[in-house]
Amino acid sequence: LKQVIFKADDFGLSPAVNGAIELAHREGVLDGASLMVGARFAADAVARAHRLPSLRIGLHLVVVAGRPVLPASVVPALVDASGEFSQRLARAGFRYFFLPAARRQLAAEIRAQFEAFRATGLPLDHLDAHHHLHLHPTVLGLLIRIGREYGLRAVRVPHEPPGLALLANEPGRWGRWLSALLLAPWIALVKYRLHRAGLRTTDRVVGLHDTGRMTATRLLKVLQTLPAGSTEIFCHPALSDAEGPWPLAVAASRAELDALLDPEVQALITNLRINHGGFCDLPHPKT
């Protein structure tokens, strides 16, 4: 049995992103999206989500490269002079691990983002994090503890297994294979902690190394080579009139939207009898 979750990140970032996510769910294969509760266009994203009750919405936790939900004066150890989280992941990770004040403020900010999500009235399908920073041990521990209070049931574990990288048979696959191999012990520990807390995860994730390149051709190849079990396939779609602080080239994000709408992709899912839905459709973890 193959179970796939097609998911988009950065819901709320811009009208072009929000519109692409709505279109990809209405007319394509997109199952869910991750909401940036502090983003400028989060309210627009929430309104769209309420019109689409079958779209599974999760929390896209932002604790780096963005703005906090709490006032900067409440979390001074987390932000720079402009009130933004650090753009430097290593620096942020160091502070979150070693500075007690940063850890206390980080806990408060994570709680505030869960509160903001709860205020939307949307069911919480899952959690992931901007730049995958929930793999950081401090962030991971806090989201498990705090998330329990807000009904958190599933978390993305961003790891593409080594074997899947080789199956891709593409340039750079050996580098992807080595990266996945080196991360495997830490990923196993992350999954153990999540499963021990009763949180669901997929068996694997696809898209981690393909940001901006999840085209229809790539998606068809992935679907044909997927092993049995559960897989999250995530992407960053946007309409061709993308605006604002969008990290991808407009053509790349439009290509990812086109992949989600592609009739061949939809036909292959049917022909291979692939089930797709949300994180909360996954079985409870075995501990």
Would you name each region that the model predicts?
Residues 129-131:
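Active-site histidine-anchored catalytic micro-motif
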Residues 1-5, 15-126, 137-287:
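Terminal accessory/targeting
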Residues 8-12:
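DG-centered beta-turn motif at the end of beta-strands
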